[in-house]
A protein has these predicted regions:
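Single conserved hydrophobic/aromatic residue that forms the stacking wall/gate
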Residues: 1-11
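Surface-exposed cleft-lining segments at the edges of enzyme active sites
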Residues: 26-32
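Short, ordered loop/turn segments at secondary-structure junctions
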Residues: 16, 60-62, 122-123
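Active-site adenylate/phosphate-handling loop in enzymes that bind or generate adenylated species
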Residues: 33-105, 151, 168
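ATP/NTP-dependent adenylation/nucleotidyl-transfer catalytic domains that generate, transfer
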Residues: 23-24, 79-169
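A conserved beta-strand->alpha-helix junction
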Residues: 9-26
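Generic structural signal for helix capping and beta-alpha/helix-loop junctions
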Residues: 19-21, 64, 127
């Protein structure tokens, strides 16, 4: 909250029934996709109620790489979320300003600034497909140094229909 207030923004908390829906009603072993959709839906609805039309996600370089790897493994396609996305159904623009910052760089900044991190209370945290992709990518990068950078280069220079030309090297 202190960082948000320092930037002139207001921290807002929204109570939902998402955990109940995902873990009690649905009971899927891998509930991440449904949970993400419900969280985004609730967030976009709340942004609309507050008259907010732009949000910055904290996706970092490692998130982009892991998403590309997950796409290849689980969907058979090469994809990563675009740096800027306009969601017409929500009237919201999503920006990802930290896409070139490694996760360790973000973590170091958080520590150096004394920013308090909210612990993830999800019951499947640490055993998700994303966590698997993260560990796999770390192993691949240890065995083949520079792989992360090459994958990020491929992501940035890939030809994704929803990526503007300006974000390509």
């Amino acid at each position: 909250r202190s960082v948000s207030r320092g930037l002139g923004d207001v921290y807002k908390r929204q109570d939902t029934e998402i955990a109940k829906i995902v873990f009690e009603d649905n009971k899927d072993e891998r509930p991440c996709s449904l949970c993400a959709k419900l969280r985004k839906g609730a967030m976009y609805k709340r942004l609309g109620e507050l008259g907010i039309n732009k949000i910055a996600y904290a996706h970092n370089k490692d998130d982009f790489i892991e998403t590309a790897l997950m796409s290849l493994i689980y969907e058979g396609r090469f994809y990563a979320f675009p740096p800027v996305t306009y969601l017409p159904e929500a009237g919201v623009t999503v920006i990802r300003p930290m896409m070139y910052v490694p996760e360790k760089g973000v973590a170091n900044f958080v520590i150096n600034q004394g920013i308090k991190v909210v612990k993830n209370t999800c019951p499947v945290d640490g055993s998700t497909k994303r966590e698997y992709a993260k560990q796999l990518m770390e192993q691949i990068n240890r065995d083949n140094p520079g792989t992360k950078d090459r994958i990020m280069h491929a992501v940035v220079n890939g030809r994704f229909e929803d990526w503007p030309e300006v974000h390509r090297n």
